[in-house]
């Protein structure tokens, strides 16, 4: 039964008070900067770390700093590597005559999971996007061209996302590469605008197998 003598709460139009101390709020803010991490997930991650023993938190921080300081780019293909030349480029069993071009290392790792490609890679570091001020000169295109003759490249596979930026980059590269080698592009088994890293292994394997020559 409702009692009229009890105080009633009115909707507050005031800005809510900060519920986290500043150090915790800063940690949450940093997690929110990560791709795919929303406010709630950021809070869960931050609170989880604080509940762990201090040595685990230190190990996490040390691993993060070590990766940031020691991991760079392969001088040949642009993939992430702790050495001047990455493991893939050093592998004598890889076919250096076939280069698969990807936008970034996440796409490379997705293709490697399929175990269907035994050639080499080249990481552009992005896609041509005039709207974002990213032109061809900002990408690793020149190093790709420099690999064609020394490595006797016979085919370049364009494994770029089916998007406006991916199509623009593919057309630009095809025009540059076709005088020197065969240029193919992975089949469109991927939804338009989708990212390669989110595609399942079977879809990626079929996209590689069904690649087509760029006219």
From Swiss-Prot:
<comment type="similarity">
    <text>Belongs to the RecR family.</text>
</comment>
<dbReference type="Pfam" id="PF21175">
    <property type="entry name" value="RecR_C"/>
</dbReference>
<dbReference type="InterPro" id="IPR000093">
    <property type="entry name" value="DNA_Rcmb_RecR"/>
</dbReference>
<dbReference type="InterPro" id="IPR034137">
    <property type="entry name" value="TOPRIM_RecR"/>
</dbReference>
<keyword id="KW-0863">Zinc-finger</keyword>
<dbReference type="InterPro" id="IPR023627">
    <property type="entry name" value="Rcmb_RecR"/>
</dbReference>
<dbReference type="GO" id="GO:0003677">
    <property type="term" value="F:DNA binding"/>
</dbReference>
<dbReference type="GO" id="GO:0006310">
    <property type="term" value="P:DNA recombination"/>
</dbReference>
<feature type="zinc finger region" description="C4-type">
    <location>
        <begin position="74"/>
        <end position="89"/>
    </location>
</feature>
<dbReference type="InterPro" id="IPR006171">
    <property type="entry name" value="TOPRIM_dom"/>
</dbReference>
<protein>
    <recommendedName>
        <fullName>Recombination protein RecR</fullName>
    </recommendedName>
</protein>
<keyword id="KW-0234">DNA repair</keyword>
<dbReference type="InterPro" id="IPR015967">
    <property type="entry name" value="Rcmb_RecR_Znf"/>
</dbReference>
<dbReference type="Pfam" id="PF21176">
    <property type="entry name" value="RecR_HhH"/>
</dbReference>
<dbReference type="GO" id="GO:0008270">
    <property type="term" value="F:zinc ion binding"/>
</dbReference>
<keyword id="KW-0862">Zinc</keyword>
<feature type="domain" description="Toprim">
    <location>
        <begin position="97"/>
        <end position="191"/>
    </location>
</feature>
<dbReference type="Pfam" id="PF02132">
    <property type="entry name" value="RecR_ZnF"/>
</dbReference>
<keyword id="KW-0479">Metal-binding</keyword>
<dbReference type="Pfam" id="PF13662">
    <property type="entry name" value="Toprim_4"/>
</dbReference>
<keyword id="KW-0233">DNA recombination</keyword>
<dbReference type="GO" id="GO:0006281">
    <property type="term" value="P:DNA repair"/>
</dbReference>
<keyword id="KW-0227">DNA damage</keyword>
<comment type="function">
    <text>May play a role in DNA repair. It seems to be involved in an RecBC-independent recombinational process of DNA repair. It may act with RecF and RecO.</text>
</comment>
